Regions:
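N-terminal, positively charged/glycine-rich alpha-helical extensions of SAM-dependent methyltransferases
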Residues: 1-9
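Class I SAM-dependent methyltransferase Rossmann-like catalytic core
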Residues: 8-18
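Conserved acidic
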Residues: 19, 47
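Conserved alpha-helix/loop element of class I SAM-dependent methyltransferases that forms part
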Residues: 20-38
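Conserved class I S-adenosyl-L-methionine
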Residues: 38-45
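Class I SAM-dependent methyltransferase SAM/SAH-binding core
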Residues: 42, 50-87
């Protein structure tokens, strides 16, 4: 049974105080520090895609992966440009 079934519907409400913008800035800074200014990045455990979308907006070719189909469906509902592959 998917532990996140049902929880995906309220996940973003529980996570609304998470500093995703700060996390994204830190990750982008770290990637650039190591010579990765763009290109493919895999977000394992992407949940509803909040961080994934922010990283895509920074120019990374994002793929989001999550074990929960419900979380992935929520992430796909938020699909923006550039497109993100969710698996």
């Amino acid at each position: 049974m998917d532990a996140y079934t049902g929880f995906a519907q309220v996940y973003d409400l529980f996570m609304d105080n998470v500093p995703y913008d700060e996390w994204c800035a830190y990750i982008c800074e770290t990637l650039k520090k190591h010579g990765i200014a763009d290109g493919p990045v895999l977000d394992l455990g992407c949940g509803t895609g909040e961080l994934t979308r922010r990283l895509a907006a920074c120019g990374y070719d994002m793929t989001g992966v999550d074990v929960s189909v419900d979380m992935l469906q929520k992430a796909m509902e938020k699909q923006t440009d550039p497109p993100i592959l969710y698996l």
